[in-house]
Amino acid sequence: MNSNKELMQRRSQAIPRGVGQIHPIFADRAENCRVWDVEGREYLDFAGGIAVLNTGHLHPKVVAAVEAQLKKLSHTCFQVLAYEPYLELCEIMNQKVPGDFAKKTLLVTTGSEAVENAVKIARAATKRSGTIAFSGAYHGRTHYTLALTGKVNPYSAGMGLMPGHVYRALYPCPLHGISEDDAIASIHRIFKNDAAPEDIAAIVIEPVQGEGGFYASSPAFMQRLRALCDEHGIMLIADEVQSGAGRTGTLFAMEQMGVAPDLTTFAKSIAGGFPLAGVTGRAEVMDAVAPGGLGGTYAGNPIACVAALEVLKVFEQENLLQKANDLGQKLKDGLLAIAEKHPEIGDVRGLGAMIAIELFEDGDHNKPDAKLTAEIVARARDKGLILLSCGPYYNVLRILVPLTIEDAQIRQGLEIISQCFDEAKQ
């Protein structure tokens, strides 16, 4: 049997250091909210492969659907020989993505591809080249999505300048002194100083920032952004790669914002652990790209498509949207109880089950505590709980449990978090 230490040594020789690894363990098998490493140790998984496992590890209905598809067809490339699961999934997404208008859907493989294609479609539809993204944003690791991403280190450090015609607005974050008025004013400054509105093809926004710290836009801000886009003929792109697929208590977070985007990207949990992503948008906008301008060899792979179709059925059969809201409330209640004993927890927040806590030195919001955050992650792992951090200051703990988690596992995870804070304080 290989140990984690031995595998980590082999990893350093075989895999470039640019591929980070948060936890120095190697997973061997998993079930719902539990993971076992190669040494047989069991962990509670509160990371979900970075928001990919809303239906848990290896949901039996998803596994059964995938096994059945594997016996029929694994790949043809949809642009060469089409297959029904791709078409069926697109038809369903056209109905489920927010917006009371005709829609079409493109399937790809990764969230980065989805965002990049959304911008490409917006540029084709508007005949413009500029894009506005936000501070703290994370949109992917391809060259263009790195330009959209509002954090240089570690994502694009040492790579030189990214593609141009990307402009940075402020994401509203009252906790850190950025009001909604500040955010809107920053867009108007772009229009005045950097790029005229008639040169902007799209504004790309995460309704709840993922890597940026789980800060959620308010419906009021999103409505102001929608009005601004309408005024200037700009496409509004909602990046729901992390917030979508039911994480926030609705299938898409934009359903809670009171307005619809022109284009929506999705990925991560949509296929229960299989690589699938997509863009859904206004039909006439999606048709702006000429034949041959969209697609990819593996885009919308049939195995991933049937997995996604089954995931959507599981959401309905197991009432997972309501469970996301119930689960989120249980997590927030438990974390708020911990925060009462630990003033270093300066904020507990989240939509649905997309929950985060933010840590500060002595509760001072001007002193983000990245060191304590990293310590809590490490202590939790030692106690059998997998957590992730995020945020521009590396001081946010995010919780991305499966929506299928058992109540006893929630209590166990919260107890471990509480113990970690108690011990770190000693």
Swiss-Prot record:
Enzymatic class: transferase
InterPro entries: 4NH2But_aminotransferase_bac, Aminotrans_3, Aminotrans_3_PPA_site, Class-III_PLP-dep_AT, PyrdxlP-dep_Trfase, PyrdxlP-dep_Trfase_major, PyrdxlP-dep_Trfase_small
Catalysed transformations (reactions): 4-aminobutanoate + 2-oxoglutarate = succinate semialdehyde + L-glutamate; 5-aminopentanoate + 2-oxoglutarate = 5-oxopentanoate + L-glutamate
MF terms (GO), sorted A to Z: 4-aminobutyrate:2-oxoglutarate transaminase activity; 5-aminovalerate transaminase activity; N2-acetyl-L-ornithine:2-oxoglutarate 5-aminotransferase activity; protein homodimerization activity; pyridoxal phosphate binding
GO cellular component terms listed in the entry, alphabetical order: cytosol
One GO BP annotation of this record: arginine biosynthetic process via ornithine
Induction comment: Induced by RpoS in response to multiple stress conditions, including shifts to acidic pH or high osmolarity as well as starvation or stationary phase. Catabolite repression by glucose (repression relieved by GABA). Makes part of the gabDTPC operon, which is up-regulated by nitrogen limitation.
Metabolic or biological pathway: Amino-acid degradation; 4-aminobutanoate degradation; Amino-acid degradation
Domain of life: Bacteria
N6-(pyridoxal phosphate)lysine, modified sites: K268
Cofactors required: pyridoxal 5'-phosphate
Keywords: Aminotransferase, Pyridoxal phosphate, Transferase
The EC number(s) this enzyme carries: 2.6.1.19, 2.6.1.48
Impact upon substituting I50Q: 3-fold decrease in catalytic activity and 12-fold decrease in affinity for GABA
Mutant phenotype after disruption: Cells lacking this gene are not able to utilize GABA as a nitrogen source, in contrast to wild-type, but grow normally with arginine, ornithine, putrescine and agmatine. Cells show only 68% of the wild-type GABA aminotransferase activity.
Binding site for pyridoxal 5'-phosphate: G111, S112, Q242, T297
Similarity comment: family membership: Belongs to the class-III pyridoxal-phosphate-dependent aminotransferase family.
Purpose: Pyridoxal phosphate-dependent enzyme that catalyzes transamination between primary amines and alpha-keto acids. Catalyzes the transfer of the amino group from gamma-aminobutyrate (GABA) to alpha-ketoglutarate (KG) to yield succinic semialdehyde (SSA) and glutamate. Thereby functions in a GABA degradation pathway that allows some E.coli strains to utilize GABA as a nitrogen source for growth. Also catalyzes the conversion of 5-aminovalerate to glutarate semialdehyde, as part of a L-lysine degradation pathway that proceeds via cadaverine, glutarate and L-2-hydroxyglutarate.
Subunit structure: Homotetramer.
The protein, known as: 4-aminobutyrate aminotransferase GabT
Source organism of this protein record: Escherichia coli (strain K12)
